[in-house]
Amino acid sequence: MEQTWRWYGPNDPVSLDDVRQAGATGVVTALHHIPNGQVWSVEEINKRKALLEEKGLVWSVVESVPIHEDIKTQTGNYQQWIDNYKQTLRNLASCGIDIVCYNFMPVLDWTRTDLEYEMPDGSKALRFDQVAFAAFELYILKRPGAEETYSPEEQAEAKAYFDQMSEADIAKLTKNIIAGLPGSEEGYTLEEFQAQLDRYKGISTEKFRTHLAYFLNEIVPVAQEVGIRMAIHPDDPPRPILGLPRIVSTIDDMQWFVDTQPLAANGFTFCTGSYGVLAENDLVKMAEKFADRIYFAHLRSTQREENPRSFHEADHLAGDVNMFGVTKALLTEEYRRKANGDNRLIPMRPDHGHQMLDDLKKKTNPGYSAIGRLRGLAEFRGLELALKKVYFND
């Protein structure tokens, strides 16, 4: 697999020199300074590409070309935003970039309640605490209708949690959930956040699927024409939250996705941490079934807790994800492609990483400190080497 590293651009505290020293050869990045919906010009794309190439790196994957909320809700100027998206794909292809990761999650890209959860070894991880999240939704945001999604016992537990929170606790939890994490392109106040949620009133799961289907049928033929492989990222966490529909969470969702738009350019970002939160998801089976459509891999593991709806980010080779089985499935697919004349490697990146060692003293992007991901990348490199020697005689 191609070893890649997510980089948030010139303002990322992790430098390109750091990336190169970590052993990555490819960079996963985006033009975060361009507002959502606007066309990425060839000039801006080439400027970023040249910045990477000056350090001996390549731009392997775009993560992400954000999808404007108007497209997801099919309101406002959504057709114009779709046309802009098509032009961005054409421009990327003309610059030699051929994998685009994106997601179709409403409002938030990913959600955690704690960005500094202390692990037994003293490192810090990201965590989703279901009780804390319920307290936020019911008693801080006070989302209309939220009580319908929680049992009386869950509401009582959330109320007890809320009652012991200080003003500082409330502010921190609110900021963690709605301020926008790395990878999210938007940040909201409580009022703005509720207004964004309100845009999805009346949009059921089935209706939301029709919106994604429309987007796919507009975009994927263009991607196919220009040689770009689109790779949708799953929902994180992979279940409905805040009354919002979620439609990329399970193996059945993946099947719907392929059936809806069967062109080869329509594929997946296989994020083991996102899919792995749901106990019913057999990740090895999913990777094997849709191997030919996996164009990018996010490798990380999560650990479900006593409350099965709560989880934290585990060490990369620990937790609930069968990383051995998933990596073997991805390598099997890579060798299959090679036998059929396609020598392109599947880009993978160590997704997230614990804040540890010297990074504990630094200001870092939550989940994206250098040393935790350095460790993850080294572990995946070793796992891949062992699998290749034992199973593939390589």
Curated annotation (Swiss-Prot):
It catalyses: D-mannonate = 2-dehydro-3-deoxy-D-gluconate + H2O. GO terms for biological process: D-glucuronate catabolic process. GO terms for molecular function: ferrous iron binding; manganese ion binding; mannonate dehydratase activity. InterPro entries: Man_deHydtase (IPR004628), Xyl_isomerase-like_sf (IPR036237). Its cofactor is Fe(2+); Mn(2+). Its EC number is 4.2.1.8. Keywords: Iron, Lyase, Manganese. Catalyzes the dehydration of D-mannonate. Belongs to the mannonate dehydratase family. This is Mannonate dehydratase. It comes from Histophilus somni (strain 129Pt). The gene is uxuA.
